[in-house]
């Protein structure tokens, strides 16, 4: 009998347990006992994914393109994703009774749009397979004489032949984490940074737009006059700055950039999705066609009236002036703002952290098996490794994939 411990009852850990147990059903001579340890209810974190709808994955069948959605771990994931991609995840869940559908933006959700349905189906399968769950907080681990000794916070000790660490990220700032367990066993941990979080802006006009959302906005990250990357996504204004997919992507790609109030990160956004010259011609034509209308009314054809007023006020332009009276310099000023608007980011909104950048050093893990190169019998899966994806189902796909790889390898 091989006894396997999984520390972490999130998507990756439960996936690893299910696949490992399913794998033994085809091997009568291989007897396995699996126990999943977690201080919280299993798969509790799954309930808030995708706004409660559970964004299971992203429909990109080319694994070489899929890995490009991961700011960290791109090369490492090539082998795992070539073995278990989004179609494999869909098939896995279909066998458990969860039908899925693909949105226009390629995000994948269960037909029910209910994360709890996904949670329940995974827990039913785990129970059917005989996987045990133990609600305790693990505080330490040792490896000696071929077995792992796992300690909980009450100093109880559990003996296992193999160990899977699947504790997820650093959002809860727990004293006892998968990082500390991995480190105690000789693994290196890269710098941990918040990722996929909201951003705090210096500009006040953003805060006046709190609650306003815009679709498919193009952006460009700039720091110290150097372009980092171009990106796009929906944008949500908040009482402290910005949130939503565009902000989340920005926070991930700038996770290791040392920006602050005195040396802010710049997110250049293009509200119009057109180059300065192209939109200038369009807006001039619009003005000439509506000379007797107020400039507020003309701009309100592109934005809500309240947003248009806030933008004009910030630029020092009188929203009550007639469009036909707008001078060239003011038009150019407005067009530049709408196509090359610089938002100065002073810091991240830490309470909104969705994933953690950083984790167990990837060079110390075999990406074909997710097995430790340092400690025999030790495996990793999920966000505890130095892998993090953008918003859109990528991080859950990493959980399903890495959990699957561990399950068939252990």
Q: What positions do the PLM features span?
A:
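Glycine-rich FAD pyrophosphate-binding loop
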Residues: 5, 21-51
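Short hydrophobic core segments
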Residues: 5-7, 35-37, 138, 157-171, ...
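Conserved N-terminal/central alpha/beta ligand/cofactor-binding core
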Residues: 39, 44-131, 137, 237
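An anion/pyrophosphate-binding glycine-rich loop and adjacent beta-alpha core
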Residues: 39-42, 48, 56, 60-63, ...
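A conserved short coil-to-beta-strand element within the FAD-binding core of flavoproteins
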Residues: 134-147
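A glycine-rich dinucleotide-binding beta-alpha-beta segment and adjacent secondary-structure elements
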Residues: 135-136, 309-388
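Glycine-rich loop(s) and the adjacent beta-strand/alpha-helix scaffold that form part
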Residues: 162-206
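A conserved FAD-binding loop/helix module that cradles the flavin
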Residues: 168-181, 185, 386-410
């Amino acid at each position: 009998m091989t006894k396997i411990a999984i520390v972490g009852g999130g998507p990756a850990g439960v996936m690893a347990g299910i696949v490992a147990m399913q794998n033994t059903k085809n091997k009568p001579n291989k007897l396995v006992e699996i126990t999943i340890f977690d201080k919280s209810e299993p798969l509790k974190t799954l309930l808030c994914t995708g706004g409660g709808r559970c964004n299971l994955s992203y429909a990109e069948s080319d694994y070489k393109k899929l890995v490009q959605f991961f700011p960290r771990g791109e090369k490492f994931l090539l082998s795992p994703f070539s073995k278990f991609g989004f179609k494999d995840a869909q098939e896995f869940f279909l066998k458990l009774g969860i039908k899925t559908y693909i949105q226009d933006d390629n995000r994948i959700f269960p037909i029910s749009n209910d994360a709890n349905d996904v949670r329940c189906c995974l827990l039913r399968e785990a129970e059917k397979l005989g996987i045990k769950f133990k609600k305790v907080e693990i505080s330490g681990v040792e490896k000696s004489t071929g077995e792992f000794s796992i300690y909980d916070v009450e100093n109880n000790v559990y003996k296992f032949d193999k160990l899977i660490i699947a504790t997820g990220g650093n959002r809860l700032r727990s004293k006892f984490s998968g990082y500390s367990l991995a480190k105690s066993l000789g693994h290196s941990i890269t710098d941990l940074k918040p990722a996929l979080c909201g951003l705090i802006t210096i500009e006040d006009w953003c805060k006046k737009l709190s609650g306003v959302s815009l679709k498919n906005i193009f952006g460009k990250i700039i720091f110290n006059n150097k372009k980092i990357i171009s990106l796009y996504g929906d944008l949500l204004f908040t009482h402290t700055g910005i949130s939503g997919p565009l902000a989340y992507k920005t926070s991930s790609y700038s996770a290791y950039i040392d920006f602050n109030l005195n040396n802010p990160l710049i997110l250049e956004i293009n509200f119009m999705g057109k180059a300065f010259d192209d939109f200038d011609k369009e807006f001039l034509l619009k003005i000439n066609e509506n000379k007797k209308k107020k400039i507020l009314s003309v701009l309100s054809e592109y934005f809500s009236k309240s947003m248009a007023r806030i933008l004009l006020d910030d630029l020092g332009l009188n929203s009550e002036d007639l469009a036909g009276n707008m001078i060239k310099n003011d038009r150019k000023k407005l067009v530049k703002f709408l196509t090359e608007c610089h938002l100065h980011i002073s810091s991240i909104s830490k309470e909104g952290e969705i994933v953690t950048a950083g984790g167990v050093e990837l060079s110390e893990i075999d990406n074909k098996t997710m097995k430790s190169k340092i400690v025999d019998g030790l495996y990793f899966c999920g966000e505890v490794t130095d892998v993090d994806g953008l918003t859109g189902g990528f991080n859950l796909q990493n959980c399903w994939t890495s959990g699957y790889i561990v399950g068939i390898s252990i």
